[in-house]
A protein has these predicted regions:
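Catalytic nucleophile loop of clan PA
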Residues: 333-372
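C-terminal cap/linker of serine protease catalytic domains
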Residues: 366, 370, 377-424
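Protease-domain processing segments flanking chymotrypsin-fold serine proteases, especially trypsin-like
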Residues: 33-170, 411-424
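Conserved catalytic-core segment of clan PA serine endopeptidases
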Residues: 129-150, 156-165, 171, 192-262
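Terminal peptide-recognition signature
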Residues: 155, 168, 174, 178, ...
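Gram-negative bacterial Sec-dependent N-terminal signal peptides
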Residues: 2-34
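Chymotrypsin/trypsin-fold serine protease catalytic domain
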Residues: 244-332
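Acidic glycine-/aspartate-rich tracts in secreted/extracellular proteins
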Residues: 182-184, 203-207, 255-258, 297-299, ...
Length: 424
């Protein structure tokens, strides 16, 4: 494996105005296919039923689940665990000054921030939109319809006759990143692909009955790792096809009326090999980062409204059934099915003007996607989820793929952008 250098790909600014639709030459497309094969990536153009409805109701989750015994927490938080909370004078949250008090009924309707689950991993979870039920005016959609939230959206797809739901985010003006299991059944080769793949940026309600703030974009081309296609990825025993090195996909979206999705809503950067992670004795020498997770879990607001979760994420190492090193990231989270494919970002938010002696610290680049929600536990008690680690691993050992990054994410993005350069 080549040197594991941490890095990111920079985000381009949001651009306004119409863009001419890209014209892709046949020779370029063939070159893209050759590139995909050489770099361990499989591409597929999903079928789109003409004017297909996205389905009714919340939809079915694609999030794969495992038991706690298959991939136990082990020492992940053992060295971080403090005392159980008491009614004494220890640290506690104050009531704040955010406005008038709420009735018990109103509080029950809100998504309350929670401290931790049975794995004692702290997190904070909340709905993104500043509203309770319904969206009577555009102001009630704030901040979900503003940047940077709106570069994340709800992903719908069809397997067989059923509609399923996931989440995804833009990392190029016309390219999404999500979980591979959202668009492909592990190891099923030519029979594993989803159809009718659709992306709704900043979704705020039921897309089958209500037009969304930024409409819908359909998938033009999907790319997944060849090992995921073949069913030969490095995976945890008892969780083959679930806890794996490369549950990652990128999707090239069709432009709409001459505009790419990112030119309307913006897009993020992406990173690899642990960008903004740090090995710290303050965290028991674990390799950790402060991570913001976005997604559309069905158990919260029927999966119609974006949820935000913040927690420390930790790189976890294991050994796959093939004897190779398994790399994942875990974090504390109350999200459930439907959150699959949603971005895990470091340094979420927008920059403030720095004055005086303040500094941004090390590795401060904003809105860097370093993972996508991949799996959770069958029990709702642990409140922990996992994601394939973006970067070099056994299957994608190179430190650079065409100047677009290292490892799995570099290979996938490079393949997509080689075949569809105008979308990048």
């Amino acid at each position: 494996m080549q040197s594991a250098k941490r890095s990111i790909v920079r985000r381009y600014p949001v651009k306004q105005g119409l863009l001419a639709a890209a014209v892709l030459l046949a020779g370029s497309s063939l070159a893209g296919l050759d590139q995909a094969k050489a770099q361990g990536v499989v591409g597929h153009s999903p079928a789109q039923t003409a004017r297909a409805a996205p389905g009714t109701g919340p939809g079915l989750s694609r999030l794969p689940l495992i038991s706690e015994s298959v991939f136990p927490l082990g020492g992940t938080t053992a060295t971080l665990r403090g005392r159980e909370g008491t009614s004494g004078a220890g640290p506690r949250g104050s009531s704040g000054a955010g406005g008038p008090g709420k009735s018990a009924q109103e509080e029950d309707e809100d998504i309350a921030p929670t401290a931790f689950g049975t794995f004692n991993w702290p997190y904070t979870h909340a709905r993104v939109a500043n509203t309770n039920i319904g969206f009577g005016s555009p102001l009630e959609r704030v901040p979900v319809t503003g940047y940077p939230f709106r570069a994340t959206g709800k992903l719908l797809m069809t397997f067989g006759s059923s509609t399923f739901v996931c989440s995804a985010s833009l990392i190029k003006k016309g390219v999404l990143v999500t979980a591979a299991h959202c668009v492909f059944d592990y190891g099923k080769r030519k029979d594993g692909w989803a159809t009718n793949v659709r992306f709704y940026p900043a979704n705020v309600s039921n897309p089958s009955t209500t037009a969304q703030p930024y409409g819908v974009f359909t998938a033009r081309r999907i790319y997944i790792p060849t090992v995921y296609f073949n069913g030969t990825d490095t995976c945890q025993a008892g969780a083959v096809g679930i806890v794996c090195n490369n549950d990652i996909a990128v999707i090239v979206l069709n432009a709409r009326r001459g505009q790419y999705a990112g030119n309307i809503v913006g897009w993020y950067t992406y990173g690899w090999n642990g960008y903004s992670y740090v090995t710290s004795d303050q965290f028991g020498n674990q390799h950790v980062a402060d991570i913001t997770q976005l997604g559309y879990p069905v158990a919260w607001d029927n999966g119609y409204q974006m949820q935000r979760n913040n927690s420390f994420g930790k790189r976890v190492l294991g050994t796959g059934t093939n004897g190779k090193q398994l790399l994942n990231t875990q974090l504390g989270s109350a999200m459930t099915g439907g959150s699959s494919g949603g971005p895990w970002m470091v340094n979420f938010g927008t920059n403030a003007a720095i004055t005086g002696t303040a500094t941004a610290g090390s590795h401060p680049a904003r809105l860097v996607v370093v993972g996508a929600t991949s799996w959770g536990y069958v029990s709702t008690g642990p409140k922990v989820q996992g994601a394939s680690y973006f970067g070099q691993n056994n299957e994608f050992p190179n430190a650079d793929y065409g100047g677009r990054g290292a490892g799995n994410i570099g290979a996938l993005v490079n393949t997509a952008c080689t075949a569809f350069p105008a979308y990048c």
